[in-house]
Amino acid sequence: MDKTKCIAALFDFDGVVMDTETQYTVYWDEVGRQYHPELPHFGALIKGQTLTQIYDKHFAGMTEEQSKITARLNRFEREMTLEYIAGVVDFMKDLRAHGVKIAIVTSSNELKMANVYAAHPELKEGLVDRILTAEMFTRSKPAPDCFLLGAEVFGTLPQNCVVFEDSFHGLEAGNAAGMTVVGLSTTNTAEAIKDKCKLSIPDFVGFNYEKMMALLG
């Protein structure tokens, strides 16, 4: 840790800040049943991937199908429930009180996030410092680009950053960025992610600035 640089906390969004992953699993499982019945548990298969990655891998050349899926997804995201992961707001407020910079670093696009801001304007009004979306980086998770951008916008170094992630791709990206990674067992089990993070937690209840700083040593 470089004490001449600020500390930054970089949060994935779905399954880390908002309790949305279960809803997405239902949506994508239905898409999988319709278009890829040979791939069971399609929702789990595409976790942590951008829409572009999903289309490139599973719907390449299927322009009409992509348009239909996107339209359905946009409707779904307008109507989905947006509830915070337990304890995350209090944790963010604790971080801000101690001068920690906070960014949401998400594979979601601006269209989806506009729905989020409408429901939770506090995200744009001081709860976090920056929100980095899929349009802002060339390579998506598991590449480290998004988290490295998080460090860059705050003028700090990877060793001063803590990443909070739930998906395998996100955990891999945080590690590839050379950052301390905390795993949320909201999407995958604690057992499944334990080797991919320095600490796994079920939510943010009881987690605070001091506990985070202890991970940085």
Predicted regions and their residues:
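Conserved SAM-binding loop
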Residues: 17, 84, 102-105, 139, ...
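Asp-based, Mg2+/Mn2+-dependent phosphohydrolase catalytic module
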Residues: 1-7, 93, 109-111, 115-217
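Ser/Thr-glycine-rich phosphate-binding loops at phosphate-binding pockets of nucleotides
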Residues: 16, 20, 106, 170
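Short beta->alpha linker loops
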Residues: 23, 46-50, 86-87, 108, ...
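Short, structured helix-loop boundary elements
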Residues: 48, 70, 85, 89, ...
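Short phosphate-binding/catalytic loops that engage adenosine nucleotides
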Residues: 98-100, 179
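N-terminal helical cap/lid subdomain that shapes the substrate entry/recognition surface
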Residues: 2-98
